[in-house]
C-alpha cells in the first residue's frame, strides 16, 4: 500500500491510498469511497488496535513552488491526522492539530503491538505531537516536545526554527529520535509517554556551523556556532 500526495494536476484532492500487487500493478483504492484524507503523506498501522493513522503534508501545487508562508494561510498545507479502521479503510476520525501541529510528516506508533500511542513530527511548528487512545476508544493528542527557535545573526529572520523532519522510535520503545533540518542537530529523548526528556544531542553541520556567516545568540550577547563534523579525521 502506498500513500499519494495529490492528483495529476497537483491538487490535494488526489490524496489517497493505493493497493499494489506483487508486481507493483495498481489493484485499486484501499480506503472506502468518500473516505480519502484531506492531505496525504505518511501512515502507520497498529493491527491489534485495528487502526491506521495517516499524516498530512500539503498540496503539490504549493510545495512544488518552494515554501511560501501565504500558502499556509490559504489552507494548502495540512494540520490533520486521519484515523482509519484497519484493514477496512473507513475514516473514523480526523484530528485537527491546530496551530501547534502544522505540516505533520513522519508518524510512528510504539512498536509494542499492545500500545495505542504514537508520535508525529510537525515540521512547520517544530513540535512532536503525541496521539493516544482515550477511554471511549476515540483518539486525542497533545504536544509532547516543542523545539525552541534559535536566535540568530545574519539570517533573513531573527529566529531560526527547528523544522523537524524525520523521526524514529527505537525498537525497544525506550527512545525517540528526530532531526532538526536547519539547526542540523539530531536529538534523543527517553520515552515517558507524557513527559519526554532530552538525553542526547549531536550537531552535524547546518546553517550555524563554524565558518558559516550565521551564528546563534546566547546569553550576554555572545554568539555560538557548532563544530564542523569530522568522521575518521575528514
Please annotate each region the language model reported.
Residues 3-13, 56-76, 130-133:
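Short, conserved, GDST-rich strand-edge loop motifs in beta-rich repeat architectures
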Residues 5-7, 57, 121-124, 133, ...:
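Short loop/turn segments immediately following the C-termini of beta-strands
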Residues 13, 39-41, 77, 103-105, ...:
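Beta-rich catalytic cores
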Residues 14-25, 71-88, 133, 191-192:
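Beta-propeller blade signature
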Residues 28-38, 91-101, 140-159, 199-234:
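Surface-exposed loop and turn segments in beta-propeller and other repeat-based domains
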Residues 44, 108-111, 168:
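Conserved beta-strand position repeated across blades of beta-propeller domains
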Residues 48-50, 114-116, 172-174:
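Short coil/turn segments that connect the beta-strands within blades of beta-propeller domains
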Residues 83-89, 130-143, 188-200:
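Short loop/turn segments immediately following beta-strands, especially the blade-tip
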Amino acid at each position: 500500500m502506498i500513500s499519494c500526495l495529490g492528483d495529476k494536476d497537483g491538487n490535494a484532492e488526489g490524496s489517497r491510498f493505493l493497493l499494489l500487487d506483487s508486481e507493483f500493478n495498481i489493484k485499486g483504492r484501499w480506503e472506502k469511497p468518500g473516505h480519502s484524507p484531506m492531505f496525504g503523506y505518511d501512515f502507520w498501522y497498529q493491527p491489534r488496535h485495528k487502526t491506521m493513522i495517516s499524516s498530512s503534508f500539503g498540496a503539490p501545487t504549493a510545495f512544488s513552488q518552494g515554501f511560501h508562508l501565504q500558502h499556509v494561510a490559504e489552507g494548502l498545507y495540512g494540520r490533520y491526522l486521519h484515523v482509519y479502521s484497519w484493514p477496512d479503510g473507513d475514516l473514523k476520525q480526523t484530528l485537527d492539530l491546530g496551530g501547534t501541529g502544522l505540516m505533520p510528516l513522519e508518524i510512528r506508533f510504539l512498536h509494542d503491538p499492545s500500545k495505542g500511542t504514537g508520535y508525529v513530527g510537525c515540521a512547520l511548528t517544530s513540535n512532536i505531537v503525541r496521539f493516544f487512545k482515550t477511554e471511549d476508544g476515540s483518539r486525542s493528542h497533545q504536544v509532547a516536545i516543542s523545539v525552541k527557535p534559535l536566535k540568530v545573526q545574519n539570517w533573513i529572520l531573527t529566529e531560526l526554527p527547528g523544522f523537524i523532519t524525520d523521526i524514529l522510535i527505537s525498537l525497544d520503545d525506550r527512545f525517540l529520535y528526530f532531526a532538526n533540518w536547519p539547526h542540523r542537530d539530531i536529538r534523543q529523548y527517553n520515552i515517558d509517554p507524557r513527559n519526554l526528556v532530552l538525553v542526547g544531542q549531536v550537531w552535524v553541520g547546518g546553517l550555524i556551523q563554524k565558518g558559516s556567516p550565521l551564528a546563534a545568540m546566547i546569553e550576554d550577547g555572545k554568539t555560538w556556532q557548532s563544530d564542523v563534523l569530522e568522521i575518521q579525521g575528514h
